[in-house]
């Protein structure tokens, strides 16, 4: 990783170029640090260039305590596996997260499992990824994600905006405005996969819409578009797929 605020308060990361193999910036709440220092809050990230073979900004997956009041703004996402990824896995709450004015690209990188110790990258080129799903073999309550906003994002991508909870841990109050996605093949890897690592669902085949939402309450998408610069069998014909979503209003248009 590049920079990892773990159970920190009142942090400003500004005017940085972060280039990493793993995640560029990770905001998290590990078990020992959560017990010692408590809430992770008031984290501002602005005016940065972020390059990673995983997420540009990752919140989680270690979420033993509360993470709140995190902003990411005015940044360039430079060829990352994901632009923004938010996970809960360990019973904590992630809330009041605000992302705005990002531009750049996301793509799927090749995994190298054949080489001992080589990484398997998380992410398949998603501009937005939010996940509240249990870890494999975990008996811990998953946790809560609520009050997350995205505003003014322009991303060339290889996969969808992915929002996924479970019936017992639904995402709440997710608002997206002025998200503009251009689907374009940039790497060499095939698509058609959803990647929910680390979780009981793991990685599995699925046609890729522009927006996928599962178990979300109060989802709002406004003034957003998707354009397909390339053709791929992995990309679904429908723009949106909603499963078990309530109180949702989605305005996402396909443009030429």
Question: Model regions: which residues?
Answer:
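Extracellular/periplasmic carbohydrate-active domains that bind, remodel
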Residues: 1-256
């Amino acid at each position: 990783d590049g920079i990892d605020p773990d159970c920190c308060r009142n942090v400003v990361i500004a005017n940085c170029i972060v280039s990493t193999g793993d995640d560029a910036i990770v905001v998290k709440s590990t078990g020992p640090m959560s017990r010692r220092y408590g809430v992770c809050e008031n984290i501002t990230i602005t005016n940065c260039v972020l390059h990673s073979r995983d997420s540009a900004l990752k919140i989680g997956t270690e979420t033993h305590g509360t993470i709140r009041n995190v902003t990411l703004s005015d940044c360039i996402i430079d060829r990352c596996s994901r632009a923004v990824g938010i996970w809960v896995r360990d019973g904590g709450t992630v809330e009041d997260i605000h992302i705005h004015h990002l531009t750049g690209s996301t793509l799927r990188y090749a995994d190298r499992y054949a080489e001992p110790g080589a990484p398997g990258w998380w992410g398949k080129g998603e501009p937005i990824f939010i996940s509240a799903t249990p870890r494999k073999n975990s008996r811990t309550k998953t946790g809560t994600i609520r009050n997350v906003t995205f505003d003014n994002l322009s991303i060339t991508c290889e996969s969808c905006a992915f929002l996924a909870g479970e019936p017992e841990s639904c995402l709440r109050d997710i608002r997206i405005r002025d998200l503009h996605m251009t689907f374009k093949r940039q790497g060499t890897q095939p698509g058609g996969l959803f990647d929910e690592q680390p979780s009981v669902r793991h990685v599995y085949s699925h046609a890729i819409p522009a927006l996928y939402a599962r178990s979300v309450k109060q989802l709002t998408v406004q003034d957003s578009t998707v354009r397909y610069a390339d053709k791929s069998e992995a990309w679904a014909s429908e723009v949106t797929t909603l499963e078990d979503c309530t109180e949702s209003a989605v305005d996402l248009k396909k443009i030429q």
